[in-house]
Amino acid sequence: MIVEVFFRNYYRNYAKFDVDAVEKREFAFQPFGGGMVRHKAFKSVEELRRFAVEKTPRHMYHSSAYYERPDEGDMERKGWLGADLIFDIDGDHLDTEACRESKLVSIACLNDAREEANKLLDVLTRELGLKPRRIVFSGNRGFHVHVADEEVLALGARERRELVNYLKAAGFDPTRFAAKLGRRKVLLYEEEVEGNLLRIRQGVEDPRALKVEIDEVVTQDIHRLIRLPGSLNGKTGLAALPLTQQDLEKDAGEIVEKAVAFRKGNLKVRFTKDLRGPVLFDRIDAGEGDVKVLPAYLAIYLELQDFGKIYD
């Protein structure tokens, strides 16, 4: 498979994995042939990179949790030590015109997701006093935010669910909210919090301002697998790209451009189904059976999305 060759070359020459405490994480991989390989452990990022070159998986994941025995197959015997707090904002979950129009990666939909991610960061930092450890473009239609503050690591599923409810304004009482963060208890009163909870004031006129559209299942799962920052997204061929908060202020087109892994050359694609609409930086107008010569990154994206086949 031509795409697999491109992935292997990327992992051999360009990949920079961004993950803390490698030796305490479970890693999981989805091969190009399908299935899932779980409960892998590595002593270093370099050992992980060698594995990626040798096996060339389509998808690479690491656990949000830290374990005493990350390679143990029995979850009860892994020895859970705590878990990062993970937030996933995905265009698939955004009810905006741009995201409804296309299920492929479009810059317009990503800008909507980027705005939602900025709203999340504002709530985390200004309302809850949490500092994101890592912000990552998923390589597809959204963003991941990792929080590793000491006070959140020991939070169980129930406490994380309370936080989800707060972020999504589910059953929200605008006069008072209590959130337990480890030993710290934050009481949020509209009249007492610095900034007077901007979301509450805006929410009187626009209820959408109260709600942050996160994937609630991801955040409350204390054993969650999340895409490995620096790896390639097997649905798109784009890199899962670590970002700064300043990067997140830029247009999504600039973010995607930095995530392009295959910048050189063109490939010939035969379309296996009709495709008409925006895809990445381009607009595609092709019918089933059409043949087009496209930039390598776009050809790989279309094959991974099952819209065409690359051939010599």
Swiss-Prot record:
Q: Write out the coiled-coil annotation as residue ranges.
A: none
Does the record's keyword annotation contain Magnesium? yes
Q: Name one GO molecular function term.
A: DNA-directed RNA polymerase activity
Q: What cofactor(s) does the depicted protein rely on?
A: Mg(2+); Mn(2+)
Query: What Gene Ontology cellular-component terms does the record carry?
Result: DNA-directed RNA polymerase complex; primosome complex
InterPro entries on file: DNA_primase_S, DNA_primase_ssu_euk/arc, DNA_primase_ssu_PriS
User: What protein name applies here?
Assistant: DNA primase small subunit PriS
Q: Which organism is it from?
A: Pyrobaculum neutrophilum (strain DSM 2338 / JCM 9278 / NBRC 100436 / V24Sta)
**Taxonomy-wise, where does this protein's organism fall, top ranks first?**
Archaea, Thermoproteota, Thermoprotei, Thermoproteales, Thermoproteaceae
